[in-house]
Amino acid sequence: MDMTKQIVDFEIKSELIGEIDQFEASDYTMAPPEEPKMVEESPQLGHLEDQNRKYSPEREVEPTLQDPSEVVDQMQKDTESVGEVKSPEKDVETELVKSKASPMNDQALTPPPRPLTSSEVVGLRDPEHTELRMCLEAKKSRSLPVSPQPQPNLKLAGSALFEFGQRSSPVETKIKTNPETKPPRRKIVPPSGEGQQFCLRWNNYQSNLTNVFDELLQSESFVDVTLSCEGHSIKAHKMVLSACSPYFQALFYDNPCQHPIIIMRDVSWSDLKALVEFMYKGEINVCQDQINPLLKVAETLKIRGLAEVSAGRGEGGASALPMSAFDDEDEEEELASATAILQQDGDADPDEEMKAKRPRLLPEGVLDLNQRQRKRSRDGSYATPSPSLQGGESEISERGSSGTPGQSQSQPLAMTTSTIVRNPFASPNPQTLEGRNSAMNAVANQRKSPAPTATGHSNGNSGAAMHSPPGGVAVQSALPPHMAAIVPPPPSAMHHHAQQLAAQHQLAHSHAMASALAAAAAGAGAAGAGGAGSGSGSGASAPTGGTGVAGSGAGAAVGSHHDDMEIKPEIAEMIREEERAKMIESGGHGGWMGAAAAATGAASVAADSYQYQLQSMWQKCWNTNQQNLVQQLRFRERGPLKSWRPEAMAEAIFSVLKEGLSLSQAARKFDIPYPTFVLYANRVHNMLGPSLDGGADPRPKARGRPQRILLGMWPEELIRSVIKAVVFRDYREIKEDMSAHQYANGQGHGTYIGGGTTTNGYHSAAAAKLAAQNAALAPPDAGSPLSSMTETLRRQILSQQQQHQQHHQQQAHHQQQPSHHQQQSPHAQSMNMYKSPAYLQRSEIEDQVSAAAAVAAAAAKHQQQQGERRGSENLPDLSALGLMGLPGLNVMPSRGSGGGSGGAAPNSAASYARELSRERERDRERERERELSRQYGSQSRGSSSGSGSAKSLTASQRPGAASPYSAAHYAKHQASAYNKRFLESLPAGIDLEAFANGLLQKSVNKSPRFEDFFPGPGQDMSELFANPDASAAAAAAAYAPPGAIRESPLMKIKLEQQHATELPHED
């Protein structure tokens, strides 16, 4: 390079300035130092421009001078952000040249030997803008026209030329590929008088280049895009793809992410592979039957050489492509802006220009405009507003506007073929983050939308957008108000509606929103496929005809880079699906999308559950990685943001443990993601420790419900404290008085709501009635489970209070101390089991039995202890026990009412039943012990079931005060020690089975298995053994499986019945 440079310098000095007019400005004749910025400007000036513009000579001169330098500069800019490095002499020379050149340069451009390819064609067209006219004719491979970056890259030939002179630092030269090899075809006049230049040409440059590209493809070196279809993928180079296909060019241009993954739908893998090979090598072999499909795909993807790509585009070939360097992210926006300009501008000046080019302008010309503007704004030196912008906004705004590659008209179809998936790690393009973009974006919106109507919206939007902070976050806040109304605006507006959306929607979370909106908009039919497609509003342009596909840009400017924006038409189906979710509820859910909601001010449109939306949003983020890096990383690692409130989780777990909902039912009911719920519920279940009923699952697992249910009974305080520990870790205390906290939707769970009066879940008719009532009362619009819960809670408590009062009146004579109603004795609470409706038949029996037993026992005990006074305070709270519709009890018994039968006198039916069952129980135990000893021959066996029997016989004579079973029972079932302790805290004489005899009548009709309770030959409720202990033992032996260690008073009935009948059914 150095040598080259020297040669060049030498030439520069030696060439005559006079020759300048023959050449296009060479880079040596670079713009003077003041202009370095401009210089970057427009490598892309093109013939288009030439055609459409009348330029004055001076203007031309300048461009020519600057042009190459611009190219160079741009490249430079791309590579290093430094300004041009020129040596002072050169600067001087350039000035000279400039002054002299200006008169002559006018004619100086050598006409290119062939029409320029699109890369050359794109030019800046602003009159005010000094345009450099660059017709580099460096040898170009026609097959590789241009990529969005190409201006700089592909012009390498030209730029490189210029580079020699221009750059003093070798570094710069290295940017160009082999500058030496590029033949400067035009003579370049060095500013100094030494007039001669040498053309260094690399003869097999093109073939070399293609070979190199192919090698890079094979080795996957420097690849920056992945194309995938049918489960296969191939890594390629954006530059090559863009050069060979305006479609890709536009696509990359719109989605400037570091390594996009493009998922091609409707493209077969063989075709894709063949096309890539074609783009890299320029030739492929295909069988005849493959040709048509291949050409069809090539047509869709606009592959040069296989499809008619440049037809109809500006003069030189497919100029429509956004020829831009990636660094200008705003191009798309500009593009749009240009389109808009076209359409909306009243300014005569731009209008005329447009008229000339209009046909191609729509998509393509726009490009030029944008580019020109873009460049200007980029350089900053030309920041003056160009009249062509609507309202005279400055280019900046143009930049913001969403320009999309012109290809859109033909494109929508193509677009559908690919989905860009953002590479999660691609860094966002920083530039867009600048605040200015938001302004631009606003502008863009106005501009882009074809009709004035759009501008209205866009303004609204833009205001919002403007403030949005560069990060994607702001976007969300920017949701334009009109967005709130889902009603789609007229198409033109629509499209831009979408755009805005897109813009807004950059926020990762907002995605769903936007897409839903866009979908709504698009779906509205305005945009049609193109519109629907890009959430980012690009679709909207379909109506415009111009920018359809690429529209994504406008919004992009707003918050983060386009990456964020990218819902491409390809994702239309997703969007459509989201239409179902209508629009994300803007309002309620936490700060989540609160900002957006606030901005939109719209009433939230209730959609599918919040959970669903969240999930879909997350899904979308996952699929398109459209979030800023942080969010996206977070999303990928940790799943969607937490969407449930701890209260809901607590209620859900309660409802599982008490109402017996399955985990999935509870998760759905409380809108908690199932996996999360399972984790929490199982944690709670594990921490609860052994169940009161002795642990083993009382319901055999049938095929239908594997382990999706948590079974067992625990004292309620225990459950509550565990849930508190698990769910409300440190940050939240569930109030001690649970009555404030109502678990389970509006159903009070016995003990803690409304004192003891609440019914237990749905367990009894009254409860069911109450539940229905609550459901009916619950405000229809209740926004969140929380509010509806509190509402139902309030109502429920009221109704309970009323009922409570009635009870008091009815039963005042029973209860001398009503004040104690609220305190339930612990055993009552623990007996308050929550059974699931799934097995109501049995659970109801148990509940009722145990409750009635408790009542009767308490009554009896009291009576024994204080014959004169029946204190209600220690009676168990029946209401908690699901006793509700038992024949002898009032519907909502309050604590002390034993019901007519239970509480009144010892000789009442309850106490009789108690005595009776006690005897039966004792007999059964003895009988059983005998049987066991027969079975095992001796106790030496040490088995828990047989070991204690001798002792236990004596012990059984005096069963513990409260234990309903004889000591023998415990001896045999040591596993129930826990239960035993629990039972000993019970009042003396509770015998569940006794109660079963009298009280179960009620559920006979409900329980198909009622007979199972008394299956023994003669052992039915009427039978009494002479010796009560013997009868109990016998009964036990008859009913319980020999090894059962899980019997406990509460579950005994259930166990026996299971033993008798269910074993055969277990699957």
Swiss-Prot record:
It comes from the Eukaryota. One of its GO terms (molecular function) is minor groove of adenine-thymine-rich DNA binding. It is found in: Nucleus. Residues 525-538, 545-556 have a biased composition (Gly residues). Leg imaginal disk at the central region of the tarsus and in eye antenna disk at the basal cylinder. Residues 326-335 have a biased composition (Acidic residues). SUPFAM superfamilies: Homeodomain-like, POZ domain. Residues 30-121, 312-412, 444-505, 525-563, 796-829, 860-879, 891-967 are annotated as: Disordered. GO terms for biological process: eye-antennal disc morphogenesis; female gonad morphogenesis; leg disc morphogenesis; regulation of DNA-templated transcription; regulation of stem cell differentiation; regulation of transcription by RNA polymerase II. Residues 223-288 form the BTB domain. The modification Phosphothreonine is found at T384. Probably acts as a transcriptional regulator. Required for the specification of the tarsal segment. Also involved in antenna development. This is Protein bric-a-brac 2. It comes from Drosophila melanogaster (Fruit fly).
